[in-house]
Structure formats: structure tokens, C-alpha cells
Amino acid sequence: MMARCRREGPILILQDTTGFIYSRAHPGKIGFTKTINAGRYKAGQLNVQTLCGVLMHSSLAVTLTGTPLGLAAVKFWTRRKYKGTLALKRHVNPTRVPIETKESYRWLENLRQSIALVGAPERCVHVGDRESDIYEL
């Protein structure tokens, strides 16, 4: 990939997170990704299910014409338990927690790895969704 990145012109580094979700008899052994509302039972109570699997945050390098150059950085992780962001905000002020301890730190890690791999930070244009809108980035 480094040889392909040495060409002239800007390189788009597209970052996003995806989840690999699995069904297992003992889901706690592979990590939690999120909880979902799976409808209602016949008795009327909510059927809330916990999804388990592995999360991946990747950075794909592409040219301005959309030609993929390869993965510039990848990070895999699991969660011991999932609490929504609203539940967390009730107990902890997110602005007082260091970025290195947050899950959103993956954006900075991938940015640094991508720049190190390409070797020309002035040519890298990093693109992310609204989740990447963090002060440290």
C-alpha cells in the first residue's frame, strides 16, 4: 500500500466503525456491542436483546477518483458490557474524562497510524461521520 500512496495528489482516509454480530449460547465470552428492542412478548412486555460480537474501526485509503489503495489502520475491540451514552452521561461528565480512556480514542489512533503509514500528512484528508466530531481530532 505504501508504494501506491507515494503517487502524487491527495489521499482520502475514510474512517468508520462496524460490528460483527454473532449469536452464541454464552454471549458474554465474545463481548457486547449493543442492546436492541426486539419487539414485545405476547404478554406485552418488551423483548430487549443484547447483541454480542466484535467491533472494528478501519481507515480505508482511496484516491480522489475512488480507487482503493488499501487499509491504512484497523482496530478491533469488544465491550465487557454495553451502556448507552445517555446512561453514561448520567454518572460521568464526558468532558472531564481523558480522551485516552474513551472508546472514541480509536479515531485518533487510526489517524496517527494512517499518517505514519502514508508518510506524508499534508496529503491526507481524513473523512469521518459525526461520531468523529471530537475536540481532540
Language-model regions: role of each:
Residues 1-137:
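Conserved, well-structured functional cores that handle cations and Mg-NTP chemistry
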